[in-house]
């Protein structure tokens, strides 16, 4: 709804003063893409995979083990002794609890790392956007999500990514 409202307001403004907007230099920017396609964000993704990969593999193994126990209970539960069945059920419940706990822990750690990365990269992205706007002499820059279609020559996302990659 917000994007539609932005679109309507921009369209109304453009139609209300065609001569003023005819001389304006307008560009479109996909802010999220500019952030995620930067070299720093790509490097973060590689580093995060190395950092969180072992935990993710541990979770997958835990899930596999729990699934195997569940399958064993379903297929052989009626043939098992009462003690064996109770032990298998208890093991399954413990693995399920461990999975939930470790999954939550991993998600929280990853979210914290993502926030830290965003905190570090946002100033660089903002600087790259400002420098690209100044260099291009743009009067108005619109978020890509607020427009239905745009010609490639009006999209400055690539320029912002390149500028951000130059910043150290």
Swiss-Prot record:
SMART domains, alphabetized: OmpH
Pfam family, one: OmpH
GO biological process assignments: chaperone-mediated protein folding; protein stabilization
Keywords: Signal
A single MF term (Gene Ontology): unfolded protein binding
Signal peptide as annotated in the record: 1-22
Gene3D superfamilies tied to this protein: Skp domain (3.30.910.20)
InterPro entries xrefs: Chaperone_Skp, Skp_dom_sf
Family: Belongs to the Skp family.
Protein name, UniProt field: Skp-like protein
């Amino acid at each position: 709804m917000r994007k539609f409202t932005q679109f309507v307001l921009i369209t109304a403004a453009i139609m209300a003063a065609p001569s003023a907007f005819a001389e304006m230099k307008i560009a479109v920017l996909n802010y999220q893409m500019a952030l995620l396609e930067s070299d720093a964000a790509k490097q973060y993704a590689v580093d995060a995979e190395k950092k969180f990969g072992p935990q993710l593999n541990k979770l997958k193994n835990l899930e596999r083990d729990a699934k195997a126990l569940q399958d064993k209970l379903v297929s052989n539960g009626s043939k098992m002794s009462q003690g064996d069945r109770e032990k298998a059920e208890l093991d399954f419940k413990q693995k399920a609890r461990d999975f939930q706990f470790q999954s939550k822990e991993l998600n929280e750690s990853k979210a914290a790392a993502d926030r830290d990365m965003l905190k570090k990269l946002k100033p660089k992205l903002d600087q790259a956007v400002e420098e690209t706007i100044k260099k291009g002499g743009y009067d108005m820059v619109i978020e890509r999500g607020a427009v239905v279609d745009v010609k490639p020559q009006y999209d400055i996302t690539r320029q912002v990514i390149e500028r951000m990659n130059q910043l150290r």
